[in-house]
């Protein structure tokens, strides 16, 4: 079911792109005068408040867009970007002492309002990237005991995505040792900016992390000890939430991105991604990767055509 949303854009925000999500317009009073400029966008569901409409009509610092969208992050992000003709958004934030409780926030990485000025600056050569998250087993590599690459074309195609400025993340539900061994066997480690393993089921407590002596892996490997904002019973299967990926990118100083894509053989792992590319399982090597690369590239081209070509300068 679609909801009616209001999104305000601060014309002279100090920190561009970040979105503050409120439960109601009156909650702006909790922000504090100095923090107004932390957020270019303020988003909330509309309840027909005359106070809200009247206040915005007389406030020259903000421009207002109203739209109808489902209460999910893909739809909300799409409508905000379309309404304000922007291809890039920053972090989604909530008030620490009165956080909004919309469904779209359930599995999206959110910051509290006071954390925005504490964010690390971008330290790598990524300028508003597309993010592509890859599964490992039966997606990039075979299911054989002695693993092989699915298709030698993968090496050139991952390089192509990197050359286009994409951030590449590997997320496998295999053990850390399995992931490290498999990546070494097929020489894929250098292609990824971050590597995540384990975390396929809900646990009552985080699993112990195993250290690795592989220095190349250490520079990219990220612990999977994340908490999920979902009511999953212990042992329940979990999707590959963008929340984890966005947190990792923030830790690396990447606070803005265009789209986020999941490439995986299991549709159940898809949760709130902008794009999902479903690949056929590969128990043994196949020479079929180019079709998936073309789908990834077509999605990115579609995105840039939809948002970037219409962006507000």
From Swiss-Prot:
Signal peptide: none annotated. Transmembrane segments: none annotated. Disulfide bonds: none annotated. It comes from the Viruses. Pfam families: DUF705 (PF05152). NCBIfam families: HAD-SF-IIIC, viral_ppase. This is Uncharacterized 36.0 kDa protein. It comes from Orgyia pseudotsugata multicapsid polyhedrosis virus (OpMNPV).
């Amino acid at each position: 079911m679609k909801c009616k949303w209001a999104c305000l854009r601060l014309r002279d925000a100090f920190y561009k792109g970040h979105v503050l999500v409120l439960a109601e317009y009156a909650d702006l009073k909790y922000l504090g005068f100095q923090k107004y400029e932390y957020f270019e966008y303020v988003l909330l569901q509309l309840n027909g408040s005359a106070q809200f409409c009247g206040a915005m009509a007389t406030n020259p610092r903000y421009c207002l867009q109203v739209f109808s969208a489902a209460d999910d992050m893909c739809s909300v992000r799409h409508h905000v970007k379309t309404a304000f003709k922007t291809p890039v958004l920053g972090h989604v934030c909530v008030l620490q002492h009165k956080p909004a409780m919309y469904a779209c926030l359930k599995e999206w990485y959110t910051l509290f309002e006071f954390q925005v000025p504490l964010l690390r600056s971008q330290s790598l050569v990524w300028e508003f990237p597309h993010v592509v998250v890859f599964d490992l087993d039966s997606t990039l590599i075979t299911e054989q005991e002695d693993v092989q690459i699915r298709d030698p074309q993968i090496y050139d195609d991952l390089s192509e995505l990197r050359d286009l400025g994409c951030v590449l993340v590997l997320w496998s539900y295999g053990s850390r040792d399995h992931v490290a061994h498999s990546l070494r066997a097929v020489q894929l480690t250098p292609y990824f900016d971050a590597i995540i393993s384990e975390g396929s089921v809900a646990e009552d407590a985080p699993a112990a992390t195993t250290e690795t002596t592989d220095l190349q892996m250490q520079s990219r490997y990220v612990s999977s000890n994340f908490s999920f904002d979902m009511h999953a019973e212990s042992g329940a299967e979990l999707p590959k939430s963008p929340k984890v990926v966005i947190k990792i990118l923030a830790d690396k100083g990447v606070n803005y991105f265009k789209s986020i894509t999941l490439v995986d053989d299991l549709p159940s792992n898809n949760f709130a991604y902008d794009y999902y590319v479903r690949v056929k399982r590969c128990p043994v090597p196949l020479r079929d990767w180019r079709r998936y690369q073309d789908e990834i590239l077509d999605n990115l081209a579609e995105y840039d055509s939809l948002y970037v070509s219409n962006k507000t300068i």
